[in-house]
Every structure is written in C-alpha cells, then in structure tokens.
Amino acid sequence: MDQNENAALYFVDRHIAEGRGGKVAFREADGQKRELTYGKLAEESARFAGALYRHGVRREERIAMIVRDQIEFPVVFWGALKAGAIPVPLNTLLASDIYEAILNDSRASILVVSEELWEVVKPATEGNRFLRAVVVIDSDESGVPEGTESFCEFVKDAPQEATVEAYGDELAFWLYSSGSTGVPKGVRHVHSSLKATADTFGAQVLGIREDDVVYSVAKFFFAYGLGNAMSFPMSVGATTVIFGGRPTPDAVFDIMREHKPTVFCGVPTLFAAVVAEQEKKGGKPEHTIRISTSAGEALPRDIGERWERLWGSEIVDGVGSTEMLHIFLSNRPGDCVYGTSGLPVPGYEVRLVDEHDEDVGEGDVGELLVRGPSSAEGYWNRRHKSQSTFEGHWTRTGDKYERTPQGRFVYCGRTDDMFKVSGIWVSPFEVEQALIEFPGVLEAAVVARPDEKDLVKPAAYVVMKPGETAPDPQAIKDYVKDKIGMWKYPRWIDVVDELPKTATGKIQRFKLRD
C-alpha cells in the first residue's frame, strides 16, 4: 500500500488484481452462516459506496454502524471508505442513551443497524437532527420498522463506484472508546494506520499468513477485533471466521472443531473460562490453533501456562489501545514470558515516566508512554482530553508499568487503580495474579479500601470456579503473603458471583470502589 492512498485499495481491491477474488474472506459461524469472497466484498462494498452517493453522502460524512459481527460489517466499513466517508463502528452492547449521545456527538448522516439491535437503538434515533437515513440489516423479506430502509433496498440497483482517492494522512474511521469509566470518546484514525498495524504486529509478531484461518473473540467494533479479524487477515488474503453471538466456552469449542482456526485471538477472562472448562472435561482439546493472542487486560501467568499445557501452543500476550489502534507492546512467539507484556513491537517506542515526566529507573513504576505509526489524530470534540493524551509524538496510555532487568515490561495497573500501602505502591494486578493461583479461584479483582483507622489497605473480590466452595479467608491471605509480601495481601476477601467488566472483558475496578 502506498502510504498516500485509500486503505480500501490495499485491503480490498488489490486482492482482485492478485487473483484472490474467489477466496473466502469471511465465513459466518452463526446466523445465516454465509460466506463472502474477496471478489464479492469488492463488488458489494463498491455498491454500498454507490448507495451512499445516491443518498447525498459527501466526503468525511460519518456513517454510524451498530452492526453485529456479520457479513454486512466489512461491506459497510470498506464501502464507506471507498466513498470517502468515515465509518464509525459502535459497540453493540450499549444502552439507548449512550447511542443517542454518540449519534449526536458524531453527527452521523447515515446509520446502519442490525435488526436484532433495533429495539435498543430506536429510541436513540427519535428526534435526531443529523440522520438522513436509518438502514436496517434484515435477515428476511418480512419488512423493516417504519421510518427505516432495509439494507437490501438501500443498495438495490446502486452503481459500483470506484474507490475515491485519499491520502494516507486523511481521516478514515472513528472508534468510540469508553475506557473503564464509560464516557464515550470518538478516536479519529487515518487511512495509513490500518496498514501500519498490519505491517508491525500483524506481520512481525503474529506472522499472519495467507493460509491462516482467524477467529477473534473481540468483535469488529473494538480496535483489537478490527485488527485481528479484518485488517490483519485481509492484509495477506487470509480467511476470518465471524461469530456474532456471545463467545461462551462451548461456542469457542464448537468453532474450533467446525471451522478449524489456526489463529485464535482472545481476552484473559475468556481464556480463563475456556481453560477451566477444558480442565473440567479432561483430556486435550480438538483444535488446529498454531498461535493465540491476548489483550484487553494483562494475562495472568497461571492462565497462560495452563493454556499452553492443554493446547500445546502459546498465548502471545500484549497491550494495545484504541488510541494506538492495536498492540504496541508484546511477547513474541517462542519467547513468551507469562506475567509480562513483553517488549515494544517493531516500529514503536515506549517510555516509563514519573509524575514529573522524568524517565524512571529499572524496577520503578512509571506511566507508560508510546509513540508509533498508528497513533490517532486525537479525540473528536474533546480538545482538553486530546491535549492531555496526545503530547507531540507521544501518547499517554494511563497504564502503570515497571521494567525488568531483561527489558521486559510488567503491568502494574491503571493509573487510577494503583494505590499505596505504608507508603509503598501496590499493583492490583500483581495481587490478583497471586489470588487466581490459589486453588479454586477463577477470577479476582483488588481495590483500595480504608480500614478502621482510615488507612488504605487492599480488598479482594474473588469468583470461584464452578462447583468450588468459598475459601477460608485466612488461608488465602496467608497464601498471598507468602507469594508477594506482607503489605500487599488483601485484608478483606469478598466472594462474588461475577466481576463488573467492560464489553472487552476489562475489570471495572471503579465500580468495586464505589
């Protein structure tokens, strides 16, 4: 890809010229279980671009997408890029009031929504003064809700338009990031960022190949999922298995058996659940996975080691962000050190700084800053937040890390999750990692809580494995003391049914502090 061209030329149109038109690009594992070849994607995305033109869409107008993982997602995303418009994929798990806020904030002129999501989305569209059309992706010919247009009718008889010219530095798409606090921010990315992540993590770490079959637990609308399931496989002409449902362990096992993915992209909570289920079943799983990736939260050492024993392949754990589009700090295949986030991905640089922006020494905790080719242009309508996050070439992540003597980076927690006990920093993640190594514990979250003297101490919330009884509190406290130190052990152990999480599986510790 020429860094000064529309990303759709490289990721879609190029495959026709290189003879991959008949190869399957996307295969649905649920719903209608359809397939979409590279050739058909090129045609249908060009037709969607034509439909946008027909509806008066101009360059850089936003096309909001509340679309589950299904064939139409890549058609709409790449079709919008071909037309010079800006696709804005939204989390499909949000509430109506959040959708309303985002639709108003983005000023989207066209909304494309899956029919299964319409009842939640409908209130968000009422009274919207920016939308010119609401397009519902319907699975049959039974009709669509009043005031909307079916996807089939929207694109019917539309001409297949040629991909518009665009510079690599032109805005291409937005992703709304809520982080762990739930306040949506529009993160603006340019055309060249997609190939930048494919060339760095996709090619040089993951080693994505044309003969790979990829399955990503993270959905398309996440930055992590967009790379895993779309830009990485499409950069080499591979095939992606898409699943719009909830990725339960049983669903994951079914996909492994039926669709035989070679690359599996998950998140720590899902890996933990799948490992626990396989251990419950006994034996080894049926699979064809050559490599797995994890992001969203730091992967606990215990989970990585148990997975590798069962699956016989590594989980390459790393850290990325919506602002950087994908993973920029990662372990490497054949060199995975569980409990660390590895080393900078080729093409990226990182720093650890203190509260005065001075570099910290080896073993000291500092905030992680990153710079590289996929950094966002900033937030939409969030000038102050943009200025405090994007500082010149460097992007603040809000993550606290320390560096080992071997140069590897160890996650300590979010800036607002860290706390001091007796004047010493405590990493919630370190305590949580010790807790889940205690027999019977599936998940754990640690937050600060004042004791009777109003001194801050660690408090733990734990989820037990199915069929396991609550642990003896003193036994688990003693276990953690022995593993990581006297001042770090949790003074309170609360057993809960589940932990609050974001849609990406990140633990929302702020809800436990409230």
Regions of interest found by a model, annotated:
Residues 22-70, 74-78, 95-100, 152-153:
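Conserved AMP-binding/adenylate-forming core of the ANL superfamily
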Residues 22-24, 136, 157-176, 183, ...:
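Conserved pre-ATP/AMP-binding loop-to-beta segment of ANL
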Residues 30, 34, 116-168, 278:
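ANL superfamily adenylate-forming
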Residues 35-39, 165, 172-196:
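Conserved AMP-binding A3 loop
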Residues 94, 111-113, 257, 264, ...:
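AMP-binding/adenylate-forming catalytic core of the ANL superfamily
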Residues 107-109, 126-138, 212-215, 241, ...:
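Conserved helix-loop-beta element of the AMP-binding
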Residues 195-216, 221-262, 277-278:
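Conserved AMP-binding/adenylation subdomain of ANL enzymes
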Residues 261-266, 276-337, 349:
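Gly/Ser/Thr-rich phosphate-binding loop
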